[in-house]
Design a protein with these regions (language model features):
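Bulky hydrophobic segments
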Residues: 1-435
Length: 435
C-alpha cells in the first residue's frame, strides 16, 4: 500500500504560478539594469547619492518613459495578489494585499538603488513614484479581477472549459491597452496644438507612416487588420448567441472601433492617428466574423493539411513576405568584410537594443517580431508538428533572417528577435492544439 505524503497532494499549479511570478519579477529587474554595464561603487557613497536623488521636471517627451515605468510594475502588484491570495473575501486577503504592497515598494526602491551601479541608467524619485503607483494599480485590479485571472490560468492548464472564450477576452483587454500605450495623454492646449501641427496624424495616412517603402506601409496596414480578427470572432459568437448572422454589423462595428481608437490616439502624444485605420479595422472585424462563420470549412482545411502542396505554398508565400519586411529587396547588400564589421559591433545581450529606444518603439518592435513569426506556429499546427518543433523551426528561420542583416546596409541583427520569434511560434502552436 502506497503511503500518501502531504507533498504528493500539493497542487502543481502552485509551483507553476510561483515560477511564472518569479520569472516576471526577474524580467523587471533585468530590464531595469540593461545594458548591464556594472561600475563598482562604495556602498556608503551609493547610499549618500541615493538619499539625494532628485525629483525631475518632466516634459511631454519624457512622460511616456515615466508612465512606462509604472506600467511595468502593474503586473508585479497584480500577480503577487492574484496568484497568492486565493481566498475570496477582502478581509482574508488583506495580509497578502499588505504584503504585496510592501514587496512592490521594496522592489522599486531596491531596483532604483541598484541602478546606481549600472550607468547610464537614470535614477530619480519620479521613477520610484511611478513604480509605486503602478504597483498599487495592479493590486487594486487584482482585488476585483483575480478570480477571472485564475480561471483564465485554469483554462490554459486544462482544468476548465471555454478556453477559446477566455483567450479572446484576454486578447480584447490586451488589444485596447496596447492601442493606447504608453498612455502619455496630452494634458494642455499647448500640447494639443503641438500634436495638430505634427506629422503624427493624417486624414488617410500620416506622414510618419509613409517614411518607408510602399510594401512596408501595406504590411503595417495588413497587420492592423489582422490584429482585429479576434475581435471579429468575439462579435460573431455574440451574434450567433442572439440568433443573428455571424457577420451582422461587423463592418460598422469595426469602423466605429477604429474611430474610437484613432480619436483616442490623437490625444496620446506618442501615438499616430490616421483615417486608413478605420478601414483596416472594419476589414479585420468582418474577416474575424467570417472566419467564425466558416469555421467548419477551416476544420476541414486542418484535417487535410497533411497535403504538402498546401503547406509548402503557404510557407513559400510567408517566407517571401518575411524577407521583404526585413529589407531584403529595398536595401543594399554588402560582402563579408561589411558583415564582419557589423558582427563586431553587434551586442548579443538579450533586449540590449530595446534600451536605446523609447518604450513605445520597443513594445511595437516586440509585437511586430511576434507577429512576423506567429505564422510558423500556424504552419506547424497545420502540419501537426509539436510545439517544440515549431519553436526550433521559428528559431532557425529567425536566425537566418537576423544573420542576413549582417550583409544589409542600415540594418543590424538583434539576437532578441530569435528568442521572441521562437517563443511566439511555440505559444501559437500550443494554443491552436488546445482550441
Amino acid at each position: 500500500r502506497a503511503i500518501s505524503h502531504p507533498a504528493d497532494d500539493r497542487d502543481p499549479g502552485v509551483d507553476r504560478h510561483f515560477f511564472g511570478w518569479l520569472a516576471y519579477v526577474a524580467f523587471v529587474v533585468y530590464g531595469s539594469l540593461v545594458p548591464l554595464d556594472f561600475q563598482p561603487l562604495p556602498l556608503d557613497q551609493a547610499w549618500a547619492t541615493f538619499k539625494q536623488i532628485p525629483m525631475l521636471q518632466l516634459g511631454i517627451e519624457r512622460r511616456a518613459d515615466w508612465v512606462s515605468n509604472g506600467v511595468l510594475y502593474v503586473p508585479v502588484g497584480f500577480l503577487t495578489v492574484a496568484l497568492f491570495a486565493e481566498r475570496r473575501t477582502l478581509l482574508t486577503r488583506l495580509p497578502v494585499v499588505v504584503g504585496a504592497t510592501l514587496f512592490c515598494f521594496a522592489l522599486a526602491v531596491a531596483v532604483e538603488f541598484a541602478q546606481l551601479y549600472f550607468p547610464p541608467r537614470t535614477v530619480s524619485l519620479n521613477d520610484v513614484v511611478a513604480e509605486c503607483v503602478g504597483s498599487v494599480l495592479g493590486i487594486v485590479l487584482a482585488v476585483y479581477w483575480s478570480e477571472w485571472f485564475r480561471e483564465m490560468l485554469a483554462t490554459l492548464t486544462g482544468k476548465l472549459g471555454q478556453l477559446g472564450s477566455r483567450v479572446l477576452q484576454a486578447y480584447a483587454i490586451g488589444y485596447v491597452a496596447f492601442s493606447f500605450f504608453p498612455f502619455d495623454f496630452l494634458l494642455s492646449t499647448a500640447e494639443l496644438a503641438a500634436k495638430v501641427d505634427s506629422d503624427a496624424w493624417g486624414w488617410f495616412l500620416s506622414a510618419q507612416s509613409t517614411d518607408r517603402s510602399a510594401f512596408i506601409v501595406a504590411a503595417k496596414l495588413f497587420a492592423e487588420a489582422l490584429a482585429v480578427v479576434p475581435l471579429g470572432i468575439i462579435l460573431a459568437r455574440w451574434n450567433v448567441v442572439r440568433r443573428l448572422p455571424a457577420t451582422r454589423h461587423a463592418v460598422l462595428y469595426g469602423a466605429l472601433l477604429g474611430l474610437l481608437i484613432e480619436v483616442g490616439q490623437f490625444v496620446v502624444f506618442s501615438a499616430v492617428s490616421q483615417g486608413a485605420s478605420l478601414l483596416t479595422r472594419a476589414i479585420g472585424m468582418y474577416g474575424g466574423a467570417r472566419l467564425w462563420a466558416d469555421r467548419k470549412q477551416l476544420a476541414e482545411l486542418h484535417a487535410h493539411a497533411h497535403n504538402k502542396v498546401l503547406t509548402v505554398s503557404l510557407g513559400s508565400l510567408y517566407l517571401l513576405a518575411l524577407t521583404a519586411v526585413n529589407g531584403w529587396f529595398d536595401h543594399r547588400w554588402h560582402g563579408m568584410a561589411f558583415a564582419a564589421r557589423t558582427l563586431a559591433e553587434t551586442r548579443l545581450l538579450p533586449f540590449y537594443y530595446h534600451y536605446y529606444t523609447s518604450e513605445q518603439v520597443a513594445l511595437l518592435s516586440l509585437a511586430s517580431v511576434a507577429l512576423m513569426y506567429s505564422p510558423v506556429g500556424v504552419l506547424a499546427w497545420l502540419r501537426r508538428w509539436s510545439p517544440a518543433l515549431a519553436f526550433w523551426s521559428a528559431a532557425l528561420t529567425a536566425s537566418a533572417v537576423e544573420t542576413s542583416k549582417l550583409f544589409i546596409a542600415d540594418l543590424h541583427p538583434d539576437p532578441s528577435n530569435v528568442l521572441i520569434g521562437a517563443s511566439t511560434a511555440w505559444a501559437v502552436s500550443k494554443l491552436l492544439r488546445r482550441l
